[in-house]
């Protein structure tokens, strides 16, 4: 698994699984040249300096998440090149060192694995699953309990038609050109994706929300699984499904929107807020945070 850079030194590649609360970050990617913005990887790269790699450690992320988006489990690979005569770190040492030296409490490394030097965290992923959390029953935004702030989209409505949303979601299943749900700014030219699973179901409130505080509220979870997604595809699909739940769109109109391949249409151009979105998991054939 090792290869030589400096004479006699060995480069080792690791896959790390990490989670973060995205509220304080300008996305997961490292931000360069802007002292007022910071990404999750800025903190990880700073922590990795303590590993004393011959070459600076850079993380290659599996799934880029936007500002305010959270991750229950994202993944990245990194290379550590030790000095001649030094053995590669064990994965356990890498995970512990990163967590020890992380300077932000909203980031945590879950697990690390030693992987081949040609392993790529983005290209090797076989599945990605996102969750989107909704709350209904809020008469005004600050009615949401403190422990649900910034982790769901609070809709100022008492009712969502879940049956209609579930019907509409079925039109998104399978292999399609999802360009109608891609936001501008992506370099991707192939907009065909396969949505393997989509579900709309009641979801739990935070366990820290008191019963009397959540009695008037109902929480819902939308879940999407694919090998990969287009830029903001999940948030735009969520916004359209919410429009169906509110009665603004009929379920069959989702099929029309999908087939239009028009990202600038009145309804599909809307993007659900970042705060309700969680990257739930990134899967690989041989590695996982619970392996």
Curated annotation (Swiss-Prot):
Q: Which reaction does it catalyse?
A: a uridine in tRNA = a pseudouridine in tRNA
Molecular-function annotations in GO: RNA binding; tRNA pseudouridine synthase activity
**Keyword set includes Isomerase:** yes
Enzyme's top EC category: isomerase
Q: What is its EC number?
A: 5.4.99.-
Q: Which CDD domains does the entry link to?
A: PseudoU_synth_EcTruA
Q: Which UniProt keywords apply?
A: Isomerase, tRNA processing
A biological process (GO) of this protein is: pseudouridine synthesis
Gene3D superfamilies noted in UniProt: Pseudouridine synthase I, catalytic domain, C-terminal subdomain, Pseudouridine synthase I, catalytic domain, N-terminal subdomain
Keyword check for tRNA processing: yes
Binding positions for substrate per the UniProt entry:
130
- Give the positions the UniProt entry annotates as the active site: 66
GO CC list: mitochondrion
Pfam families assigned to the protein according to its UniProt record, in alphabetical order: PseudoU_synth_1
HAMAP family (UniProt xref): TruA (MF_00171)
* Family recorded in the similarity comment: Belongs to the tRNA pseudouridine synthase TruA family.
User: Which protein, by its recorded name, is this?
Assistant: tRNA pseudouridine synthase-like 1
């Amino acid at each position: 698994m090792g290869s030589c850079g400096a004479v006699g030194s060995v480069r080792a590649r690791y896959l790390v699984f990490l989670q973060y609360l995205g509220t304080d970050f300008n996305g997961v990617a490292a931000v360069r040249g802007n002292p007022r913005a910071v990404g999750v990887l800025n903190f990880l790269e700073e922590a990795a300096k303590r590993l004393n790699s011959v070459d600076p450690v850079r993380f290659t992320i599996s799934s880029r998440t936007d500002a305010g988006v959270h991750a229950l489990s994202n993944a990245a690979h990194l290379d550590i090149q030790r000095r001649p005569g030094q053995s590669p770190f064990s994965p356990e040492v890498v995970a512990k060192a990163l967590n020890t030296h992380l300077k932000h409490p909203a980031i945590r490394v879950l697990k690390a694995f030693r992987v081949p030097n040609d392993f790529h965290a983005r290209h090797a992923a076989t599945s990605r699953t996102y969750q989107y959390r909704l709350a209904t029953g809020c008469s005004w935004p600050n009615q949401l309990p403190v422990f649900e702030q910034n982790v769901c989209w609070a809709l100022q409505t008492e009712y969502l038609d879940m049956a209609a949303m579930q019907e509409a979601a079925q039109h998104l299943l399978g292999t399609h050109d999802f360009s109608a749900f891609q936001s501008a700014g992506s370099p991707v030219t192939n907009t065909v994706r396969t949505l393997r699973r989509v579900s709309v179901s009641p979801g739990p409130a935070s366990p820290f929300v008191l019963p009397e505080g959540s009695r008037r509220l109902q929480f819902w979870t939308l879940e999407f699984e694919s090998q990969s997604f287009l830029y903001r595809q999940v948030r735009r699909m969520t916004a359209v499904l919410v429009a169906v739940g509110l009665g603004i769109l009929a379920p069959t109109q989702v099929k029309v929107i999908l087939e239009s391949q028009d990202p600038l249409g009145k309804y599909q151009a809307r993007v659900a807020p970042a705060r309700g979105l969680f990257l739930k998991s990134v899967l690989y054939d041989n590695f996982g945070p619970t392996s």
